[in-house]
Amino acid sequence: QHLKEAFPQAAILIVSVGDRDYKTEEGELRTMPGIKNLVRYQQNLAADEAVAFWNMFEAMGGEGSMADMVHAKPSLANYDYTHINFRGGKHLAGLLYESLIYGKEQYDRRRAYYEEEP
């Protein structure tokens, strides 16, 4: 809310947290217990404040995706199962860019449709 008041003409995009894994007592990698709740909270906050939201957790592949990024060839994330690396950042940046372009195209189509109506 403070940012919207301070910069009323600015477009605001909330990017959710990504996946983050931990090892269970059995040694299995799992998404940390609070990640999905945090993503939902961020999504609700964006909706409540009428700002854009991009779900990086889902863009990464959802639950367990951090391990997939770590073990990708070449690796897209670090072996701490928390942080993406440069290649992973470049990959996710491309996905965000595609989402923004798609959203702009949909906006332009809707706008053209409503401008055509009598």
Placement of each model-derived feature along the sequence:
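Catalytic His-Asp segment of secreted/periplasmic serine-dependent ester chemistry enzymes
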Residues: 19-118
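Structural beta-sheet core signal
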Residues: 14-15
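A short helix->loop->beta-strand "cap" motif at the edges of active sites that frequently abuts
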Residues: 6-11
